[in-house]
């Protein structure tokens, strides 16, 4: 080749363009994964599920026959959870809450298999928060209604001749009390899940 005006050989003149290789771009993920917080969320829902199932199972098994003497007259008694609307409400809400917690756990397991974030968007976090709040209040309402009936059975009615029904029916009263306790524990863990949802929302 001929020379250029500056006296340099044309083969020596050129523009060097840096090679564009595979550039690794480190971007901060838009959605925090927070493995520890995800584990806590799964744990609270699992415990809430277990407590709801126990509450339902214990109340369904609350049945007993006995007898009671009033003014020297022996009266046969039969206690069954299905005789009370409040106890039926507790069983129903425990079943629905257990189904809700189980569905959330299955969704979380599906995301874990796909290595996806536990909470994928703010809308999903709000949905979780709303659901956890609703079922926490529902379990608290059901537990309170059932507790009123259980307390009436244990203490009787004041200023009347009705006695303590738990003396001739101890198994029924004990199972009912255990079921109500599990319902309140399920409420507490659902409320804890709602708090975790708020933490997710505040960091998204």
From Swiss-Prot:
GO cellular component, one term: plasma membrane
Glycosylation sites: 80, 153
Superkingdom classification of source: Eukaryota
A matching Pfam family: CASP_dom
InterPro entries named among the record's database cross-references: CASP/CASPL, CASP_dom
Main localization of the protein described in the UniProt heading: membrane
Residues that span the membrane, as ranges: 40-60, 89-109, 125-145, 180-200
Membrane topology of the entry: Multi-pass membrane protein
Keywords, ordered alphabetically: Cell membrane, Glycoprotein, Membrane, Transmembrane, Transmembrane helix
UniProt subcellular location: Cell membrane
Extracellular side stretches: 61-88, 146-179
Cytoplasmic side: 1-39, 110-124, 201-204
Similarity comment: Belongs to the Casparian strip membrane proteins (CASP) family.
Quaternary context: Homodimer and heterodimers.
Protein name, as recorded: CASP-like protein 3A1
């Amino acid at each position: 080749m001929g020379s250029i005006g500056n006296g340099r050989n044309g083969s020596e003149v050129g523009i060097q363009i840096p090679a564009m290789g595979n550039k690794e771009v480190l971007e901060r993920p838009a959605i925090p994964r927070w493995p520890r917080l995800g584990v806590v969320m799964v744990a609270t829902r699992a415990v809430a599920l277990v407590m709801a199932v126990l509450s339902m199972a214990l109340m369904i098994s609350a049945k007993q026959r006995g007898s009671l003497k009033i003014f020297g007259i022996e009266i046969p008694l039969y206690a069954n959870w299905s005789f009370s609307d409040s106890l039926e409400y507790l069983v129903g809400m425990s079943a629905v809450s257990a189904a809700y917690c189980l569905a959330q756990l299955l969704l979380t397991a599906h995301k874990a298999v796909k290595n996806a974030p536990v909470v994928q968007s703010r809308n999903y976090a709000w949905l979780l928060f709303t659901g956890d709040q609703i079922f926490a209040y529902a379990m608290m309402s059901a537990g309170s209604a059932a507790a009123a009936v259980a307390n009436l059975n244990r203490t009787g009615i004041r200023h009347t001749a009705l006695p303590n029904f738990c003396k001739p029916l101890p198994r029924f009263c004990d199972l009912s009390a255990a079921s109500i306790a599990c319902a309140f524990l399920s409420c507490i863990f659902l409320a804890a899940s709602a708090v975790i949802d708020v933490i997710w929302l505040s960091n998204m």
